[in-house]
């Protein structure tokens, strides 16, 4: 009797799809460094193809540049610089505005395929901290998923339904 019950339980577990989230690669980087970061998109929205990825760039990130993606239209939205930007500009950086959001849209990533959306950025010089890059994933039919939740102290990101892609900042 135990064997059929175990097999039935295993069958139920196999029928439940694994929940995959938009993630950031690498998962960690030296604080203050320049990083090639890839937003990994493992699926669409309940079977619908992904047609838009928008990533929010936190204030204080002075360098953020997207990699163009063939077949996708690229938009860079900007915001006025923070006061801290003046000190950053004194070190040879001449951007007049900070990048606020990077959007790839107009392409089509089927639900059963995987892809990466790449950007280069200088991560904050905050050893021991975590950089969160909230992402909104738009799909055919108007559905969207906001991957923007941050874990509370003591909580793990994998416990959240829609965790924001994150990168740990290590000492140099």
Question: What is each model feature region?
Answer:
Residues 61-98, 165-171:
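A surface/secretory-pathway sequence property marking extracellular, secreted
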Residues 34-70:
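Low-complexity, serine/threonine/proline/glycine-rich extracellular segments that form mucin-like
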Residues 31, 138-172:
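Extracytoplasmic/periplasmic copper-protein system
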Residues 127-137:
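Short, surface-exposed ligand- or partner-binding patches at beta-edge/loop junctions that are enriched
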Residues 1-7:
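Bacterial N-terminal signal peptides that target proteins for export
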Residues 102-129:
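Low-complexity, intrinsically disordered segments enriched in Ser/Thr together with acidic residues
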Residues 15-17:
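N-terminal signal peptide c-region/cleavage motif recognized by signal peptidases
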Residues 19-41:
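N-terminal edge beta-strand
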């Amino acid at each position: 009797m135990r064997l059929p019950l175990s097999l039935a339980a295993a069958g139920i577990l196999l029928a439940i799809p694994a929940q995959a989230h938009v993630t950031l690669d690498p998962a960690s980087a030296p604080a203050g460094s320049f990083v090639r970061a890839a937003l990994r998109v493992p699926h669409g929205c309940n079977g619908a193809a992904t047609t838009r990825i928008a990533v929010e760039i936190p204030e204080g990130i002075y360098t953020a540049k997207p990699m163009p993606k063939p077949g996708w239209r690229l938009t860079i939205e900007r915001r006025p610089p923070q006061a801290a930007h003046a000190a950053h500009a004194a070190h040879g950086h001449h951007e007049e505005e900070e990048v606020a959001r990077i959007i790839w849209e107009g392409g089509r990533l089927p639900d059963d395929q995987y892809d990466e959306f790449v950007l280069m950025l200088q991560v904050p010089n905050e050893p021991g901290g975590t950089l969160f890059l909230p992402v909104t994933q738009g799909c055919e039919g108007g559905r969207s998923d906001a991957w923007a939740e941050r874990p509370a102290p003591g909580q793990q990101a994998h416990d959240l339904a829609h965790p924001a892609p994150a990168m740990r900042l290590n000492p140099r």
